[in-house]
């Protein structure tokens, strides 16, 4: 049996990088419609893309295998989420995606000590990048909330980004622990100029 061929338009779109169709300040969505590049939808798509790239940067670091596998799975989910956002009315991220993240939070957090104070983002380079990814995830979530004020957004998509920032926090702690680094607790008495 021969493999199914991509529709000609899709194959052409993916092989041709410079199209000039966006030079007028609009961009094409997956359903063929065009929207302004400064629309809330495009902002959300860009924020999710930036988050995926930030996780890719984190994956360039030496990480424990379970962490790397988890992050790679998340990158696939984020690509699906970008697809969902690029086709109005399409749903790709489901409750099952959210549950998977919640399970991962529980699994990785089980090996960590309980926190009684806030921690400072940092530690190893990999843990620091996980904290950067966490903040980018929060920004992507805010972009989705802004978009939801004017057009439908899947409920699971918003919950996914919220849980993802929680997981990235836990993964930062996990990576530090694997490297033998302690969490640095925030201390109020250390605030202010010295």
Task: Give short role names for the model-derived ranges.
Residues 2-194:
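Phosphate/pyrophosphate-binding loop motifs in nucleotide- or prenyl diphosphate-using proteins
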């Amino acid at each position: 049996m021969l493999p199914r061929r991509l529709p000609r338009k899709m194959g052409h779109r993916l092989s041709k990088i410079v199209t000039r169709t966006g030079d007028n300040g609009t961009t094409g969505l997956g359903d063929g419609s065009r929207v302004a590049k400064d629309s809330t939808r495009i902002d959300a798509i860009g924020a999710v893309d930036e988050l995926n790239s930030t996780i890719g940067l984190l994956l360039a670091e030496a990480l424990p295998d379970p962490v790397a596998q988890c992050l790679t799975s998340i990158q696939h989910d984020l690509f699906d989420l970008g697809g969902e956002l690029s086709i109005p009315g399409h749903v790709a991220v489901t409750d099952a995606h959210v549950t998977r993240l919640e399970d991962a939070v529980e699994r990785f957090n089980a090996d960590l000590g309980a926190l009684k104070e806030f921690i400072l983002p940092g530690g190893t380079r990999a843990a620091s990048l996980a904290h950067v990814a966490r903040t980018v995830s929060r920004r992507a979530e805010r972009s989705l909330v802004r978009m939801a004020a004017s057009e439908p957004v899947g409920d699971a998509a918003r919950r996914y980004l919220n849980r993802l920032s929680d997981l990235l926090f836990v993964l930062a702690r996990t990576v530090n622990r694997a490297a033998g680094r302690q969490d640095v607790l925030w201390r109020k008495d250390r605030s202010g100029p010295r």
